[in-house]
């Protein structure tokens, strides 16, 4: 991860140190600076022109007309946040002293396919906790792991202890619904326990210039097998629209592992490595700087479809049951 960050930093530095334009600390200057940062360094402009019809030049003209020199900071923030929302990217944020501008439509407006209270009932009161992993053996001898956030650290020892405890189970459910991401290292560390060999899981590319199409050749990404205990039985990963960023990458990687399927809804996406830049007034903008792809060289920015589509049914919720968990248990029981 540190090496990846340094590569991104060097690419952004190389593409921004020539003929750098200095903008005034005015509403117009800050808007122009923000638009230019995205125009030269955001990694999905061409892709989103194709998929959602984004025209970044048209966006510039439209939002430039919303400015006036006497507008307040909250008014400017609203205009700039609305402009950034045109990118439809949850990795894009505007940080000010008063608020964080954000885009959450990647999960809002979709069924959550998750009832937290019911999920907690499956864990019960006697579940185990290994760092960020909550786990237990269900009464049909299926192992069940909940990982709420990849911001919660896990070590090799934690994962090994969990899998050792679940070793006699007939199968394993890994529930990452609602996991909005975190550290890629933790996502890759967990996935490494589900392959016995080095496998290709996807690709990444880097900006090499200020043009929308200025990218390096695709660089392959591999998943290395863990040197400790590795899971050899069927496993199902439960997903929903709340799976974003590092969780999106985790799902991508797990789909490349033998004996692993995903069940639920499409993930929320988030297929770009984020980077941060500063506006003249000191506000910070975070944006996607280099894109990730799956092993078929397809974008994962707008999410990954499940192997087995499944929705949380209202009639099951009324019975205190989770349709996704019950379906996964049934499938694992047949293997």
Predicted features along the sequence, with ranges:
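C-terminal "post-core" interaction segments
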Residues: 18-39, 74, 141-142, 171, ...
């Amino acid at each position: 991860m540190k090496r990846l960050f340094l590569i991104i930093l060097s690419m952004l530095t190389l593409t921004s140190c020539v003929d750098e334009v200095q903008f005034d600390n005015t509403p117009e200057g800050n808007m122009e600076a923000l638009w230019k940062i995205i125009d030269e360094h955001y990694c999905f402009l061409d892709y989103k022109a194709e998929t959602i019809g984004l025209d970044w030049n048209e966006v510039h003209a439209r939002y430039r007309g919303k400015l006036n020199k006497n507008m307040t900071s909250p008014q400017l923030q609203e205009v700039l946040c609305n402009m950034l929302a045109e990118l439809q990217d949850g990795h894009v944020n505007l940080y000010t002293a008063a608020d964080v501008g954000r885009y959450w439509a990647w999960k809002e407006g979709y069924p959550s396919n998750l009832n937290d209270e019911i999920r907690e009932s499956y864990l019960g009161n006697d579940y185990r906790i290994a760092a960020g992993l909550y786990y237990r053996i269900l009464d049909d001898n299926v192992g069940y792991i909940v990982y709420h956030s990849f911001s919660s650290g896990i070590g090799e020892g934690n994962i090994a202890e969990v899998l050792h405890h679940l070793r006699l189970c007939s199968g394993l459910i890994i529930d990452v619904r609602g996991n909005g991401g975190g550290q890629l290292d933790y996502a890759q560390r967990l996935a490494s326990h589900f392959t016995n060999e080095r496998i290709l899981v996807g690709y990444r590319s880097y900006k090499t210039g200020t043009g929308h199409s200025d990218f390096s050749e695709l660089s392959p990404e591999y998943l290395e097998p863990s040197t400790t205990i590795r899971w050899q039985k069927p496993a199902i990963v439960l997903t929903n629209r709340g799976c974003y960023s590092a969780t999106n990458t985790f799902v991508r990687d797990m789909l490349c592992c033998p004996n692993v399927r995903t069940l639920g809804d499409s993930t929320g996406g988030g297929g770009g490595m984020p980077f941060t830049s500063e506006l003249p007034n000191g506000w910070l903008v975070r944006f996607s700087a280099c894109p990730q792809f799956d092993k078929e060289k397809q974008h994962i920015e707008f999410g990954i479809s499940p192997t087995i589509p499944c929705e949380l049914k209202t009639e099951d919720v009324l019975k205190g049951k989770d349709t996704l968990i019950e379906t996964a248990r049934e499938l694992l029981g047949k293997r």
